[in-house]
Amino acid sequence: RLRARLAGEALPTVIVDCTASDAVAAGYEDWLAAGCGIVTANKLANAGSLARWRRLHALAAAHGSPYHYETTVGAALPLLGSVRALVARGEAPTRFEAVLSGSLSYLLAQVQNGLSFSAAVAQAQALGLTEPDPREDLECRDLVRKLLILARSAGAGLEPSQVEVEPLVDAAAPRIEAMDVRWDARVRQAQARGERLA
């Protein structure tokens, strides 16, 4: 419906997507093909299949449609634009060292400092640090999305299946509190090695 409505618009149109909705992201290809610009914080379209990533960028270029997703990685720092500029100059980064998840960094710091894992998750959620569904963070899905967007912006043709992560929670655990003992043990193991969780 939106595409049909936008087809009659004489003025340039920009769609701003501040959701985490795949249903909204599913419209990107049609909107770009219609000449609409897109500004998005939604990671789903850019972190899906590599073929989808390439289609979106090809459509944006072919139709002169601005396509901006800077806020998907780095909390709106001008990181992706800088990476793309390096690639355009032939100086593509070959390595990144980064904290890709502020929420996971916060969680691990709280657990390291003695808070139970479940309490740290509740606190991070109350502070608005996690995704609306904290499993996106705890199962590292949000982190993988950021990594894919960053790597693809640097020219790497990665598929989601090529990224290996260790989720912070066991999907089979009936409740988050079931993870407290595991994380307490991990803190003690790290401390015994003179290390910290990070």
What positions do the PLM features span?
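Rossmann-like NAD(P)H-binding beta-loop-alpha module
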Residues: 61-64, 68-127, 141, 149
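Short conserved micro-motifs on helix faces and helix-strand junctions that flank
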Residues: 32, 39, 98-99
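Hydrophobic beta-strand scaffold residues
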Residues: 38-39, 66-67, 131
